[in-house]
């Protein structure tokens, strides 16, 4: 059962300008420690590092849309974090207000699955999020 679908498309150059202007203040406000660490591993290639941030920014926007709130009503940027499963597949971890919203939307007795697709092709980055409620054990 699909709970929500969200998508977002962002210009990577826009993210680069915000990082240039606000630096760590922006990065610390928007991204989780794990997301910043992922981008830091790509620091030797500035375009790749900025694209990493842009894809994660788009994922947060898409996830907030799938939750039906956008970035408001107690759902904040750092409540949504992009993680990679052991297989390499990207997914999202929700905390705080985003997790509370997800719990409100999830029917009793079902588990949540968050599918995430990320892509970039300079100068654009895109994310799609599908949040589903599934029978336990069918993740």
Curated annotation (Swiss-Prot):
Name where it mostly resides. cytoplasm
* Cross-referenced InterPro entries: 4-PPantetheinyl_Trfase_dom, 4-PPantetheinyl_Trfase_dom_sf, ACPS, Ppantetheine-prot_Trfase_dom
In short, the EC number is: 2.7.8.7
GO annotations of cellular component type? cytoplasm
Per the record, what are the reactions this protein catalyses? apo-[ACP] + CoA = holo-[ACP] + adenosine 3',5'-bisphosphate + H(+)
Question: Which cofactors does the annotated protein need, by name?
Answer: Mg(2+)
MF terms from GO for this chain are: holo-[acyl-carrier-protein] synthase activity; magnesium ion binding
Q: Please state where this protein is localized.
A: Cytoplasm
Keywords tagged on the record: Cytoplasm, Fatty acid biosynthesis, Fatty acid metabolism, Lipid biosynthesis, Lipid metabolism, Magnesium, Metal-binding, Transferase
**What does the entry list as the binding residues for Mg(2+)?**
8, 61
Enzyme class, spelled out: transferase
A GO BP annotation: fatty acid biosynthetic process
Q: Does the keyword Ribonucleoprotein apply?
A: no
Which domain of life does this protein belong to? Bacteria
NCBIfam families listed in its UniProt record: acpS (TIGR00516), pantethn_trn (TIGR00556)
Q: Which family does it belong to?
A: Belongs to the P-Pant transferase superfamily. AcpS family.
Outline what the protein does: Transfers the 4'-phosphopantetheine moiety from coenzyme A to a Ser of acyl-carrier-protein.
- The name this protein goes by in its record: Holo-[acyl-carrier-protein] synthase
Q: What is the lineage of its organism?
A: Bacteria, Pseudomonadati, Pseudomonadota, Alphaproteobacteria, Hyphomicrobiales
